[in-house]
From Swiss-Prot:
GO terms under cellular component: periplasmic space
Organismal lineage: Bacteria, Pseudomonadati, Bacteroidota, Flavobacteriia, Flavobacteriales
UniProt name for this protein: Alkaline phosphatase PafA
Entry binding sites for Zn(2+) 2: D305, H309, H486
Record gene name: pafA
Keywords: Hydrolase, Metal-binding, Periplasm, Phosphoprotein, Signal, Zinc
Gene3D superfamilies assigned to the protein according to its UniProt record, in alphabetical order: 3.30.1360.150, Alkaline Phosphatase, subunit A (3.40.720.10)
Origin species: Elizabethkingia meningoseptica (Chryseobacterium meningosepticum)
Length: 546
């Protein structure tokens, strides 16, 4: 018979066991938020510092930990690889994402990084927009590892205007990944994740937030004469936006232009506002950060990239985009304070790559610059035809790499080495070229570090080209005659911000050298979970406190 004394003893024992379990639980934040500001050069933190408010970038700098000397440790420095490397702690040679696109030597065609014809679009009828998944990714992400550590009870969501910047950070088995459809102005996904859009996504889409954001056009946040960190408003090296005939403020017809082409919102600061509002909706819709099981939200802020590409780093448009993003971040952090609680969430902010100054801007200030070969594939194929008598020997030229068509070589009875040597010799004559490397012989190449290591890390034997080209400093692809671009090893493309704030983070900064690939191991160490499967980086001891 169970006496009152024995019953009370049993209750005390069970209560003690439950208390011990709670006490011994691994200390983790309720929510991790990984923010990637697309194309954010490290110096943007300080170029516009005097105009930032206290709640956005300055909050991270003044209450969090800033790493001032973080570089990307591979080439090419592009969006898909950047997001993959941040969240895998790995490099293209291992994780398999060798570019936004690459040439598939077996299929004989260009392949987009997240393209997947085995899945169907959800939320749109456009296959090109919706047929995407992480199947081309060979390694696990830190978000995957969190799922493995919690027996997949953690909620993981990726949000971006860009498909690749939502899909790759969220990993192989997230709760969801959502991206923007230019044809409808709504967020969508694919059947890789779900058969139908969750109610919270439909509710958000039905609010028609993009139209509301562009309704009043785009004018400068501050009086335009205060944008002293930027060039004058009307310069020849800036691109146009919408129906405006000059690259100048104000952009009064934005609402009309958006209705004609909904993807236009990408090239305005309001694309970032939209993304962060969608991120807020994801937190609410998935009840993220409400219990002791850590959740993970990945957010790519893509409009900084689109605005940067179109106008260039020294434009008033870019400065205004960052000042508005600063305010959006302050609102987002305030919402996290209310929903999750100060000290209960961990945020890190970085970038997938930087950007070069516009060629026109550099020329105006007597800096070394120029354009890379206008149409290298066409020009070189003409020379190869004359030399070897075969057409289309070069199958593709992308990511500063040259791919040879193996079938053409075989049919023409040509040796790869002979053709490659000839092309390398010809490329070395180009004034824009610094080095030309055979990807079969990178280890033996007599080029300095860190270029050599970055080429090795970026080379994927299955997906990269036969020749790697290193351009001279300041030389941009010919398609970037307006605005700017990125892809190279130089500091303007490879030097990125890295800030941590919130749970478990002390205030401070470090000038010690670190790499993009150190981010995922650092987050893994803070969460006390296994590193991603292909990680080559190491935890940043200043951040984790030991």
């Amino acid at each position: 018979m169970l006496t009152p004394k024995k019953w009370l003893l049993g209750v005390l024992v069970v209560s003690g066991m439950l208390g011990a379990q709670k006490t011994n639980a691994v200390p983790r934040p309720k929510l991790v938020v990984g923010l990637v500001v697309d194309q954010m050069r490290w110096d943007y933190l300080y170029r516009y510092y005097s105009k930032y408010g206290e709640g956005g970038f300055k909050r991270m700098l003044n209450t969090g930990y800033s790493l001032n000397n973080v570089h990307i440790d591979y080439v090419p420095t592009v969006t898909a690889i950047g997001h993959t490397s941040i969240f895998t702690g790995s490099v293209p040679s291992i994780h398999g994402i060798a570019g936004n696109d690459w040439y598939d030597k077996e299929l004989g065609k260009s392949v987009y990084c997240t393209s997947d014809e085995t899945v169907q679009p959800v939320g749109t009828t456009s296959n090109s927009v919706g047929q995407h998944s992480p199947r081309n990714l060979w390694s696990t992400t830190v978000t995957d590892q969190l799922g493995l550590a919690t027996n997949f009870t953690s909620k993981v969501v990726g949000v971006s205007l860009k498909d690749r910047a939502s899909i790759l950070p969220a990993g192989h088995n997230p709760t969801g990944a959502f991206w923007f459809d230019d044809t409808t102005g709504k967020f969508i996904t694919s059947t890789y994740y779900t058969k139908e859009l969750p109610k919270w996504v439909n509710d958000f889409n039905n609010k028609n937030v993009p139209a509301q954001l562009v309704a009043n056009g785009w004018n400068t946040l501050l009086p335009i004469n205060q944008y002293t960190e930027s060039s004058e408003d009307n310069v020849e090296w800036e691109g146009l936006l919408g129906s405006k005939k000059t690259p100048t403020f104000p952009y009064t017809d934005l609402a009309k232009d958006y209705e004609a082409k909904k993807g236009l919102i990408r090239t305005t600061p309001f694309g970032n506002t939209l993304t962060l509002q969608m991120a807020d909706a994801a937190i609410d819709g998935n009840q993220m950060g409400v219990d002791d099981i850590t959740d993970f939200l990945t957010v790519n802020l893509a409009s900084t990239d689109y605005v940067g590409h179109n106008f260039g780093p020294n434009s008033i448009e870019v400065e205004d985009t960052y000042l508005r993003l600063d305010r959006d971040l302050a609102d987002f952090f305030n919402n996290l304070d209310k929903k999750v609680g100060k000290g209960n969430y961990l945020v890190f902010l970085s970038a997938d790559h930087g950007a070069a100054h516009s060629v026109g801007f550099m020329q105006a200030h007597k800096m070394p610059t120029g354009f890379f070969v206008e149409d290298m594939k066409k020009e070189m194929n003409a020379k190869l035809k004359q030399k070897f008598g075969a057409d289309n020997i070069i199958a593709a030229a992308m990511n500063y790499q040259v791919y040879f068509d193996r079938k053409v070589l075989a049919d023409s009875k040509l040796e790869l080495d002979d053709v490659r040597d000839y092309v390398m010799t010809e490329l070395k004559k180009e004034p824009s070229v610094l080095y030309v490397l055979s990807t079969d012989e990178i280890w033996e190449s007599s080029i300095p570090e860190p270029i050599k290591s970055r080429v090795i890390n970026g080379y994927n034997w299955k997906r990269s080209g036969d020749i790697q080209i290193i351009s001279k400093d300041g030389y941009l692809s010919a398609y970037s005659k307006k605005g700017t671009t990125h892809s190279v090893w130089n500091s303007y493309d490879s030097h990125i911000p890295l800030l941590f704030m919130g749970w478990g983070i002390k205030q401070g900064e470090s000038n010690q050298p670190y790499h993009m690939t150190d981010i995922a191991p650092t987050v893994s160490s803070l969460l006390k979970i296994q590193f991603p499967s292909g990680a080559v980086g190491k935890p940043i001891t200043e951040v984790i406190g030991r």
